[in-house]
Structure formats: C-alpha cells, structure tokens
Amino acid sequence: MARAPAQARGSRGLNCLARSQQTGIPAQETDDLFSTCYCEETEEDTAHQEAGMTVDCLSIPKKKLAQSQKKINQFINSKMSTKANKELIRCFILSQIVFGKEHWKCAQALANLAYGYLTLRGLPAQAKKHAEKARNTLLTWKRNTTSDKDKKEILETLVRLYYTLGVAWLLQNHGKQAYIHLQKAERNMKELKELNNGNICGIQVSEKDLTIALGRASLAMHRMNLALAYFEKAICDVILDKGHNTSELISLYEEIAQIEQLRKNHKQAIQYLQQAYSICVSSFSEVSPQTAEASALLAKAYAMSGASEYRDAVEIYFIRSISTYQTLGSEDYETLTAIEDFCTWLIENGEKQEAYRLLKSTLNSGNFGDCGKKVAETFYNMGSICFAKGELGEAIELLSKCLMIQSLVYGSEHIKSIETKSLLSLLQRWRLKETLEKNRKEASGGETFQKTVITLLQ
C-alpha cells in the first residue's frame, strides 16, 4: 500500500487541535491533547498499514477521556479543586474530539465544567457562561432522542445545568432570575423521577440541594413564607432520611432561624437554634468550632428578641462561645467577632464599662496576630465607648490607633480610613475648644479675683 503524504498524515492531529482552540479554553490546556490526537507513525504502524490495517485515531482520545473522568472524582475526593477543574476542561476538549461539538455528550461535559466552576472554584460568572452555551444543545437532544437511557442522562444534566445557573444568579444577587432557573431544574427533576419510576438516588444535584437553593432564592426575593416552606420541606426530608440528630440539620436549622428572625418570630428562631446547638454538642462535643459558632448564634438570637427574661441566656451563650474559641486556639477573627458581638449587646444594655473592660483585656492579651481589620474595629468600638462616656482624650488615643491600622490594612483613601479620620478630627477640635474654654474661664476667674482683692484693700 502506498504511503500517505506527510501533510495528510498530520491533518488529523491539526483538526483535533483546531477544535480545542475554538472552545475558548486556554492554549496551554491543549498541549497534551495534541499529542494524544496526533497518531505518530512508528515502524510498527507502518507495518500494520502495509498489512492493510487502519489505525483508529479516536481510540486514544476515548481512552484519555475515560482516564480523565476517573481523575475528576479522585481529585474531588482529595479536595484538590483546581486540579479537578482542569480535568473537567480536559474532558470537555476530549469530548469535542470524540463526539463532535453538537453531540449531547459534549454539551454534558460543558455543563459539568460549568458546575465545577460553581462548586469547586466559586466562580459564578464563568459557570453561567458555560452553562448557557450547553443549554440549547441539550434541549434539542432532549426533544429528539428516542433512547430512554440517553434521555435520563440528558435530564440529569439539565437538572445540574439549571441548578448551576440558578445558584450562579443567586450569588450575583439576582433572586428572581435564580428562582426561575431553579424552577426549571425542579421540572426536569420531576420528569427524570417519572421516567425512572420515582428513583433518583445518586444524582449529583439532590432534591435536598434543589429545595434549599429554592428557599434561598425565595429569601433573596423577600418572599419569607415561601422560603420558610422550602426550608421546612428540606428539614422534613433530611429527618425522614437520616433521623433527628444528623449533623446535616445544623445549617438548615440555622438558616430557617434567620428567616424566622426576619419575620420577627424570635421565639421560633430560638427554638431552631437550640436544636442546632444540641446537635452540635452531640455530634462534635461541647468544645468544638461548630458548637462555638452555634452558641454565638443562639446568644445573638436571645439578644435580638429584646426580652428581659433572656438576659442571662445571652451572657451564658456568648461566654460559652468565647471560652470555646479561646480554648481551641481558634482563628483570631472568630474569637474577636464573638467578643465584639457580646460587647455590642453590653453597650446596648447600658454596660459600657463592662464592654470596655472586655475589649481592653482582649487587646492586652496580644494573641491576635495579623487580624488587622478586627483589631481596628475593636479600637474603634473602644473609642466610641469612651466618647459616649465623655472621655475625649482616651477616645482620641484609641481612634488614632484605629486609623493607623486601617491605613495599613485598607489604605489612607479607603472609606473606612476617611470616616475614622473625620471623626478623629472632629473630636480633636472639640477637645481644643474645651481646652480654650477652660483656659478662658481660668483667666477670667483670675482677673475677677485680682479686682476683688484690690477693692478690699482700698
């Protein structure tokens, strides 16, 4: 058999590379793919060709695709998000080569990449861009496919795609758009359930995930009752599946408590947070970051109620939270946040001296490393307390320290630095005015005394 010209032999590899370049994926991601697509000729290949055998150029990309799909799960399980995302890009490029750009499996790979950008990288803009590109192809194949097996996969992919779009819109503070797309995910999930005789176990986006996302989108639209209904459903589903004491309920109780607080239903919010706290203690022990956070949330819920009978509970749970964080040697930011929340409550309840003492002892401990933002806030709060008490000198000293840290952390032109500087300048003018007034009075008093003495002597 006559040997093919060199240009023809290399054209397959060049075509494969051209496809990858059309996707908009960075060029460096395609380097390895070119070598996998390009069927480099060896003496053995030549022998096969001479024997009348044809080399299947797609066999190598198919093998690479299977390997890449396996690697994705391995990287995700190992919490290697960036590597997993790179493999998703590789899968998409290989799917274009193996199936063609208009095939639903290629659109599925692109939808998977979009979901990866959302869940692995936290990049909603990129997630939306890729999901929108994949949508039309998947919808066309959904209408035209006759295979139940393919339709099930397409429906599952559409659930994932619309969920990705919904959550991406939600992260960009567009509640209505988020809700519309999540409803589409819900409709496709219902269709998948019917086609699968009610069994949808093991799909990537679960019913619970979708229900929670719908609840959050409802909350973003300020539809409190609807949000409440979704979270109640999510809680019921989790309890039916895993019981009353599963740690999965903690975040759900905390979120539904937030909704109840917005509805001014403080007693119900407190009940939910008490349940979250109890599960934290039983699941993680009393000295754990989860329990410390739950304790702080419960303290704030008691404080938000404004009820005098909860005053002791506020102190108890704030002190538990702070003590737990300090025992664990937790992140300085978390400890300072709990202390500042407690001090805010103390100030609101007229205990400025106690708040000041606590803030001062916190700073004097010197265990807060590089938490510049929180330390600056602490100095600001202490300065505000001193100002409220009429101690201008102490307030100026504390606000000066706050401004110094803010200028280092944010820069002197940042709004926080500018606001602190304005307040500091105002206090300094007041102190100067007070000093001048005092001196004037003293001088005036001295002159009056001299006149009185002279009069008496005469």
Swiss-Prot record:
SMART domains: TPR (SM00028). InterPro entries: TPR-like_helical_dom_sf, TPR_rpt, TTC23/TTC23L. GO terms for cellular component: centrosome; cytoplasm; midbody; spindle. It comes from the Eukaryota. Residues 175-198, 246-278 form a coiled coil. It comes from Mus musculus. This is Tetratricopeptide repeat protein 23-like. Its main location: cytoplasm. Signal peptide: none annotated. Keywords: Coiled coil, Cytoplasm, Cytoskeleton. It is found in: Cytoplasm, Cytoskeleton, Microtubule organizing center, Centrosome; Cytoplasm, Cytoskeleton, Spindle; Midbody.
